[in-house]
A protein has these predicted regions:
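Intrinsic-disorder/low-complexity detector
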Residues: 2-185
Length: 185
């Protein structure tokens, strides 16, 4: 539990936009981006509240299961098991979903396309529980999904995935290409 609280607190303290920055969005009449960032922050808070249960290391299958996949973060090769692979997939999907919303918000606000300036891209912790993979790995894959989602949302396209009923989903072949998981068995 301490790790999760530490991760979320670090995200809140270091990466959450100060109130003055949010007010700046309102001043610039960037209402859609302001609303998107407010939703992102509310979702982070809800996530924190949902993950209050203590992690039981004695029965955690992640601890007892051997590595079954390798993956790359930049030029570094890492290894994980099925639980970690699932978290990385989740990171890409959450990133795509949040990217679509941020891209749509910038388009609605008639702002230039700039995924790197989006708060969700900078934070990249949405959905991270502090388990199974390093936070930096989660952030990397979240941003890979975010970038593609932002492109689809800003351009009103479905090049990398789809967005239906308020939820985005990246295409399976795109997900596979991003992750580049290699089975070790």
């Amino acid at each position: 539990m301490k790790l999760l609280e530490s991760v979320l607190l670090q995200s809140y303290v270091q990466n959450i936009m100060p109130l003055s920055s949010l007010k700046m969005l309102q001043t610039q009449q960037r209402n859609a981006q302001y609303a998107a960032q407010q939703r992102y922050l509310a979702n982070l808070q809800a996530q924190r509240q949902q993950m209050q249960a203590q992690r039981n290391y004695n029965n955690d299958p992640y601890i007892t299961n051997p590595y079954s996949y390798s993956y790359r973060v930049g030029n570094t090769v890492r290894q994980t098991n099925q639980y970690g692979a699932d978290v990385l997939k989740q990171a890409v999907n959450y990133g795509y979903d949040q990217g679509v919303q941020a891209g749509r918000a910038d388009r609605q606000d008639r702002r230039p396309s700039s995924y790197r300036n989006a708060f969700g891209y900078q934070d990249a912790n949405y959905g991270y529980s502090g388990q199974y993979v390093a936070q930096s790995d989660y952030n990397y894959y979240f941003r890979e999904g975010f970038r593609r989602g932002y492109t689809d949302g800003y351009g009103s396209t479905s090049q990398y995935g789809s967005f239906n009923n308020g939820s985005g989903s990246i295409l399976g072949n795109v997900l596979t290409a991003i992750l580049g998981l290699t089975n070790l068995r």
